[in-house]
C-alpha cells in the first residue's frame, strides 16, 4: 500500500483512538486540569492531521513532542511558568499512603528546571523508553540518558535537603 493511502482519515482515526487518552494524560500532568489537557490534545491531533506525512511510525513520542512544543509556546506567550499540580490532582489511592512523600517529591520536582522536570516526567510518568524520550526532546538517545541521569541526581539532592526524605527512583531505564 502506498503512503498516500496510509495517511487518510482511517489512519487518523486509528492514531486518535490509540493515543488520545495518552495525550490527555500528558496534558493533565502538565496543566493540572482535564479541560485544558483535552484542549491541548485537540491541538496536538490537529497538528498531526496537518502534518500527517511527517508523522513517524513511532507516533506517541512524536505526539508528546508536539504537545511539549505547544505548551512551551503557550507558556512563552503567557510569560508564565508551568503550573504546579495541586494536591487535589493527586489520585485518591495516593492520598492514603505516602502522601507526605508524594508532596515532598512534587515539591522537589517543582524546584527543578523545566528541562529536568520534562525528562523525569517522560520516563517516570509517561513510561517512555530512552529512545522515545529522546524523540520527544529532539535529541539523541545518549543525550537523553545523560539528561535523565543529571536530573535524577539533582532531584535526589533536593530530596535529601528535606527532612526524613528517603531515596526515590523516578522511572526505569528501557
Which residues are covered by each model-predicted region?
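C-terminal edge and immediately downstream basic/flexible tail or linker adjoining helix-turn-helix-like DNA-binding
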Residues: 1-6, 11, 135-136, 153-174
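Residue-level preference for hydrophobic side chains embedded in well-ordered alpha helices
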Residues: 15, 19, 23, 44, ...
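Arg/Lys-rich amphipathic alpha helix in sigma70-family domain 2
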Residues: 50, 54, 58, 65-85, ...
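A short, charge-rich alpha-helical start-of-domain segment used by transcription regulators
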Residues: 2-25, 35
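Internal acidic/polar
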Residues: 5, 73, 80-107, 129, ...
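Conserved RNAP core-binding helix
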Residues: 16, 24, 34-51, 141
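DNA-recognition helix of helix-turn-helix
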Residues: 68, 131, 137-161
Amino acid at each position: 500500500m502506498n503512503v498516500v493511502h496510509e495517511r487518510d482519515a482511517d489512519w487518523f482515526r486509528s492514531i486518535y483512538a490509540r493515543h488520545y487518552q495518552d495525550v490527555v494524560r500528558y496534558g493533565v500532568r502538565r496543566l493540572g486540569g482535564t479541560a485544558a489537557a483535552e484542549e491541548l490534545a485537540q491541538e496536538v491531533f490537529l497538528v498531526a492531521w496537518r502534518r500527517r506525512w511527517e508523522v513517524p511510525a513511532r507516533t506517541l513520542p512524536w505526539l508528546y513532542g508536539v504537545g511539549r512544543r505547544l505548551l512551551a509556546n503557550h507558556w512563552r506567550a503567557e510569560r508564565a511558568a508551568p503550573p504546579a499540580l495541586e494536591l487535589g490532582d493527586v489520585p485518591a489511592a495516593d492520598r492514603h499512603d505516602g502522601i507526605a512523600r508524594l508532596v515532598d517529591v512534587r515539591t522537589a520536582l517543582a524546584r527543578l528546571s523545566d528541562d529536568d522536570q520534562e525528562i523525569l516526567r517522560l520516563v517516570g510518568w509517561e513510561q517512555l523508553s530512552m529512545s522515545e524520550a529522546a524523540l520527544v526532546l529532539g535529541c539523541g538517545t545518549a543525550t537523553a540518558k545523560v539528561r535523565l541521569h543529571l536530573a535524577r541526581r539533582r532531584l535526589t539532592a533536593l530530596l535529601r535537603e528535606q527532612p526524613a526524605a528517603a531515596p526515590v527512583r523516578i522511572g526505569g531505564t528501557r
